[in-house]
Amino acid sequence: MREPEFWRRRSLLSLLLMPLAALYGAIAASRMRKPGRSIAVPVICVGNYHGGGAGKTPTTLTLVALLRELDETPVVLSRGYGGSLNGPVEVDPDRHSAAEVGDEPLMMARSVPVVVAKDRVAGATLAMSRRASVIVMDDGFQNPALAKDVSLIVIDARRGIGNGRVIPSGPLRAPLPLQCERTDALLIIGAGSAADPVAARLKSKGVPTLRGHLAPDPACVEALRGRAVLAFAGIGDPERFFATLRASGIEVAAERPFPDHHPYSGDDVAALLDRARRDGLTLVTTEKDLARLGDQPQLAEAGLTALPVTLALEDEAGFRRFVIAQLGAARDRRFRGNRR
């Protein structure tokens, strides 16, 4: 689904939906306040305040890489949005498809252990049976089932939190004050000032703000330079992907945005191939979209390129110190709890 335009700014339609937003917000707040199940290992949640893309997946992968450097054994836990399997199941990229486990888990499972489960407690149990020393939740900030030791919230610097209102009046999944109360750190990705008011609000509560940007793979960028491309993406913020291509010096001759987690049909693929062949364009998409496209020989023959992106942090040492401190505090709480 593409988010409505009125979610980005306050408008009459947004105002008219406020009564429904108040009801939705009250239900969401009541749900968030429920105590979650505590487990034997620390749980770090990478989430956001709103629906749509913000950069959670690259953040999750960066966090996992850091945890491995710290001699931890991280396992990613996801609900597998868009997948048919309830789980819990460990994702096998050679056996599973995006239709079964979701595009993000399938993409991440190529480099990190990933468990998919609609029941997050059951998923955490499976992750611990795989000797996880830390569980990294990809999304699930508003879900109360599993108690979280650390909540790292990711916000896009250009989009911020839209009009700051709750669904359906705006993009927020729950009232902002409650979400801020449960935030341990804020990560702002990209250039822009739309997230600054949230950062200021959290700073007043002593919550640190980190900053970073998404960096495309240099070798892939170099290979695409000098070519005109047809860029397509079915992610939370396709425009950010198109902007990343342009900022890298790639000529984007045509754009085709799709809804987030869009299941590509044969007609979609045929239309993309026809346009690319007609205008002499190279097809470029995201790694998430490539996971959903699956095995499409005609796309491979046409030279489809998926552009890998990674999170580049402005203060890697600060991020490292934050994670080490939070893990230490989480384990200390468990030690003190076991002594009672």
UniProtKB/Swiss-Prot annotation:
GO terms for biological process: lipid A biosynthetic process; lipopolysaccharide core region biosynthetic process. The keyword Kinase applies. It comes from the Bacteria. Pathway: Glycolipid biosynthesis; lipid IV(A) biosynthesis; lipid IV(A) from (3R)-3-hydroxytetradecanoyl-[acyl-carrier-protein] and UDP-N-acetyl-alpha-D-glucosamine: step 6/6. ATP binds at H50, G51, G52, G53, A54, G55, K56, T57. Keywords: ATP-binding, Kinase, Lipid A biosynthesis, Lipid biosynthesis, Lipid metabolism, Nucleotide-binding, Transferase. It catalyses: a lipid A disaccharide + ATP = a lipid IVA + ADP + H(+). GO terms for cellular component: plasma membrane. GO terms for molecular function: ATP binding; tetraacyldisaccharide 4'-kinase activity. Its EC number is 2.7.1.130. The keyword Lipid biosynthesis applies. Belongs to the LpxK family. HAMAP family: LpxK. Transfers the gamma-phosphate of ATP to the 4'-position of a tetraacyldisaccharide 1-phosphate intermediate (termed DS-1-P) to form tetraacyldisaccharide 1,4'-bis-phosphate (lipid IVA). This is Tetraacyldisaccharide 4'-kinase. The lineage of its organism: Bacteria, Pseudomonadati, Pseudomonadota, Alphaproteobacteria, Hyphomicrobiales.
